[in-house]
Amino acid sequence: YTEDQRGVAGGFIADPDVLDTWATSSLTPQIATGWGVNPDLHAKTFPMDLRPQGHDIIRTWLFSTAVRAETLASSVPWYNTALSGWILDPDRKKMSKSKGNVVVPNEVLEKYGSDAVRYWAASARLGADTAYDEGQMKIGRRLAIKLLNASKFVLNLGATEKSVITSQAQGRVLINALDRSLLARLAYLIEEATAAFEKYEYARALQICDSFFWSFT
């Protein structure tokens, strides 16, 4: 069809029930920051810092949002975009109900727990598709359990009142080689993990934290 056939016999008409969903969602940053409702909040929080989204809606949601912000405010809508990939099946094929390879989240959470699922999700890199891997969840569950047990062990050592611990620690110089090594490694870990998070490389932060914990257990 051509434009001159719109609304004429043998031509076409627009569907009156179609709504462009991006018309409203492209204003997400403005709406969330109180545009037109709370001027002070909007001035402090727009543009936003981060938009997390999938790579499949760059040409729709991201593009529409950027255009609206430029048109209405001569501004970018946010300063950073975190693009996630898709979750693929273990054979790295796209999940779909018709193929029968869809995973039900509730069943996974019931089996491994939320911390294990978070561990697996955090091991994925931004912009890259990730295969569903229960093996990683098992590793994450093992780490979560060990962290809990180690925390209980440490908290049960000696005094638990903060004031007592502080008074006992004042003026004490660590001379044990293992203690000094642990603190040096911890300082390095904090520096590296912080740098990774600043660059949104949370998979890197997870890896070095995981390595640090197991090296001292």
Outline where the language-model segments fall.
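Aromatic-rich surface patch/π-platform used for binding flat ligands and interfaces
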Residues: 175, 179, 183
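Intrinsic disorder/low-complexity segments
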Residues: 162-174
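Structured secondary-structure scaffolds
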Residues: 1-158, 182-217
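S-adenosyl-L-methionine
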Residues: 159-162, 178
